[in-house]
Structure formats: structure tokens, C-alpha cells
Swiss-Prot record:
This is Phosphopantetheine adenylyltransferase. Belongs to the bacterial CoaD family. Reversibly transfers an adenylyl group from ATP to 4'-phosphopantetheine, yielding dephospho-CoA (dPCoA) and pyrophosphate. InterPro entries: Cyt_trans-like, PPAT, Rossmann-like_a/b/a_fold. Its main location: cytoplasm. HAMAP family: PPAT_bact (MF_00151). ATP binds at residues 11-12, 19, 90-92, 100, 125-131.
């Protein structure tokens, strides 16, 4: 029986406990999840792509079922190249749905053989975003409970603490 593979794309700048929640729960459904870090030159990232990948790998540890990769170009092309058939997207609130719905419909118009699975973030992380974490951290606010210790350490280094 072929492996059920899903791709979980995002900028992960930085990865949060909300992202990890989606990965953990996604692994209950899929044999393998590829965490695909988008290389987006238009986005002003705090962490360069290689640092984001290293942080995600450190946080995921020795997971044989979660792989970290990077991609450019059309997501559906990348998903197909990986032998996956599903894109996982996390939703925090209704406000996320409209944008994600548009992306899913666009992907569907490009190819019929890749599905998008929306997963609601668990309640403790329903407000959490990488942007909020970066803002709170930049103002020297508490981010324990929002990101893993390795990410907090990396943020502290970025903000000279």
C-alpha cells in the first residue's frame, strides 16, 4: 500500500507550538508529512531560509515521519514532485478561512489530483502566529509556551538578548 504523504507548507518564520500542533495531529492521519518552507523573496523574513529549516529540524528531532524541505514556485508542482496528494493548511479563525479557501480553489483549478485539508488549530494556539511571536519577542515580552526553547533562544539572539 502506498504511503499517504501530505505537504504542510508555510514560511515558519519562526515555527511555533501552533505549527507543531498541526504537524503532530497530521501525523495521526498521514504516514509522512513534509514541512515545506517557502522561499519567498517578497516576504521580509526575520530568519533566513536555512535558519528556519535548521530550527524546524531541531524542534522535530529524530522524527522519521516528518521531513523538512524547502520549495519555490507553484506549490502544487512541488506537492506532485514529492509524491504527495494532500496539502495541509492550519486555520486559527474564520478570518483565515477566506484567504485559505481562495488558495485551495486556485490550486484546485490548476490540478484536480491534489486536495487541501484544513485543520483547525487546537484552542490553546488559536490566536498564535509567527508575526505575533516576533512582535512580542522584539519588545522583550514573554514567549514561553508559544515556541519551543530552541526557537526562543534563536529569537533572543536575533533581538540581542
Amino acid at each position: 500500500m502506498p504511503l499517504k504523504i501530505a505537504v504542510y507548507p508555510g514560511s515558519f518564520d519562526p515555527i511555533t507550538y501552533g505549527h507543531l500542533d498541526i504537524i503532530e495531529r497530521g501525523l495521526r492521519i498521514f504516514d509522512k508529512i513534509i514541512v515545506a518552507v517557502a522561499k519567498n523573496s517578497e516576504k521580509n523574513s526575520l530568519f533566513p531560509t536555512d535558519e528556519r529549516i535548521a530550527l524546524i529540524k531541531e524542534v522535530l528531532g529524530d522524527s522519521e515521519r516528518a521531513e523538512v524541505d524547502t520549495f519555490t514556485g507553484l506549490l502544487v508542482d512541488y506537492v506532485r514532485d514529492q509524491g504527495a496528494t494532500v496539502i495541509i493548511r492550519g486555520l486559527r479563525a474564520v478570518s483565515d478561512f477566506e484567504y485559505e479557501f481562495q488558495l485551495a480553489q486556485m490550486n484546485r483549478s490548476i490540478t484536480q489530483d491534489i486536495e487541501t485539508l484544513f485543520m483547525m488549530t487546537s484552542v490553546p494556539y488559536s490566536y498564535l502566529s509567527s508575526s505575533i511571536v516576533k512582535e512580542v519577542s522584539s519588545l522583550n515580552g514573554p514567549i514561553e509556551g508559544l515556541v519551543p526553547p530552541a526557537v526562543k533562544k534563536a529569537l533572543d539572539a536575533k533581538f540581542n538578548r
